[in-house]
């Protein structure tokens, strides 16, 4: 303690003439001479103050999903749009606004499942732009033609083909008559192909002769019927019917003889019989018309 002097003034030491102590400067931070622990952090394993290199952080680059042509034709894209409206029931006429809301709601759901990052308006603009791409156009063509697009479609088609083949095999095994029918049809087609040109010309000539005979006899019968109607003799009808029956028998006998001469009897007989029935039907129609005209004439008299 400093003792107070007179007049209450404390006698202070004279610091002006006292020399200060000289301290050495601090060493640099990385110097091993520092002992205050403010240098480099000591290594835990080695215990030395050597610097430790920190490895750089590895940044993983993640691909940002984009709405491109490949994503649009993927499983959730245009192929999924075929089955979006399977369970939708539209009300029809008078409920157009409700049906439109339902349609837009289903489309929004499909767009959100495909690419939830975009709003529906931006999604529609993007799809409209992608519609000109070649991949999208080919996908749309395959959808319109009902062709397989996804792997599931190919698998289902192969399964159906295999089932159909198994069904065909079992049906042929169970029904042996089908094979006999196919063999008979093949034999008939071979017969028709094996006809020579001479035989075909003969068949055509017989057809033409039969048609000419029928037409000539129809004309002669119509003329005689007109004359008989003028004479008003009921006996004429019976005579004409007898003549026509005899003529038909003669023609049928002639055709049968021609058919017997032909080696391919079965194939030709069917065609000639069909033509003969058609000619008989046309003759009957003409006969009915003539009978009707004769009745009208007699009633008028």
Curated annotation (Swiss-Prot):
Keywords: Cell cycle, Cell division, Cytoplasm, DNA damage, Mitosis, Nucleus, Phosphoprotein
Compartments, as annotated in UniProt: Cytoplasm; Nucleus
GO aspect biological process, one term: replication fork processing
Keyword Cytoplasm set for record: yes
Region spans: Interaction with TIMELESS: 67-143
A Pfam family that the UniProt record links to this protein: Swi3
GO molecular function: DNA binding
Residues of the signal peptide: none
GO cellular component: chromatin; cytoplasm; nucleoplasm; nucleus; replication fork protection complex
Positions of the UniProt region annotated as Disordered: 1-61, 240-261
Modified residues (Phosphothreonine): 233, 244
Modification type Phosphoserine: residues: 194, 222
Superkingdom of the organism of origin: Eukaryota
Cited PANTHER family: CALMODULIN-REGULATED SPECTRIN-ASSOCIATED PROTEIN 3-RELATED, TIMELESS INTERACTING-RELATED
Subunit structure: Interacts with TIMELESS (via N-terminus), which impairs TIMELESS self-association. Associates with the MCM2-7 complex. Interacts with RPA2, PRDX2.
Family to which the UniProt record says this protein belongs: Belongs to the CSM3 family.
Protein task: Plays an important role in the control of DNA replication and the maintenance of replication fork stability. Important for cell survival after DNA damage or replication stress. May be specifically required for the ATR-CHEK1 pathway in the replication checkpoint induced by hydroxyurea or ultraviolet light. Forms a complex with TIMELESS and this complex regulates DNA replication processes under both normal and stress conditions, stabilizes replication forks and influences both CHEK1 phosphorylation and the intra-S phase checkpoint in response to genotoxic stress.
Protein name as it appears in the record: TIMELESS-interacting protein
């Amino acid at each position: 303690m400093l003792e107070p002097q007179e007049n209450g003034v404390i006698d202070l030491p004279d610091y002006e003439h006292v020399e200060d102590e000289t301290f050495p400067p601090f060493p640099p931070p990385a110097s091993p001479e520092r002992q205050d622990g403010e240098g480099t952090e000591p290594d835990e394993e080695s215990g030395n103050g050597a610097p430790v290199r920190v490895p750089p952080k590895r940044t993983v680059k993640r691909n940002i999903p984009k709405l491109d042509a490949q994503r649009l034709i993927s499983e959730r894209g245009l192929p999924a749009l075929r089955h979006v409206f399977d369970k939708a029931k539209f009300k029809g006429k008078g409920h157009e606004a409700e049906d439109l809301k339902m349609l837009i709601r289903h489309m929004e759901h499909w767009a959100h499942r495909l690419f939830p990052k975009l709003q529906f308006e931006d999604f529609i603009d993007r799809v409209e732009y992608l519609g000109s791409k070649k991949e999208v156009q080919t996908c749309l063509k395959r959808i319109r033609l009902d062709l397989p697009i996804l792997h599931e479609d190919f698998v289902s088609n192969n399964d159906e083909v295999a089932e159909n083949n198994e069904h065909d095999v079992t049906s042929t095994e169970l029904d042996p008559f089908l094979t006999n029918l196919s063999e008979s049809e093949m034999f008939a087609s071979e017969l028709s192909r094996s006809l020579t040109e001479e035989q075909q010309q003969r068949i055509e000539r017989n057809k033409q002769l039969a048609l000419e005979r029928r037409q000539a006899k129809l004309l002669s019968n119509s003329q005689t019927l007109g004359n008989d109607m003028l004479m008003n003799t009921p006996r004429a009808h019976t005579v004409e019917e007898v003549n026509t029956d005899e003529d038909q028998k003669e023609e049928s006998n002639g055709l049968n003889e021609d058919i017997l001469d032909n080696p391919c009897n079965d194939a030709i007989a069917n065609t000639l019989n069909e033509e003969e029935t058609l000619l008989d039907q046309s003759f009957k129609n003409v006969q009915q018309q003539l009978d009707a005209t004769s009745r009208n004439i007699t009633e008028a008299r």
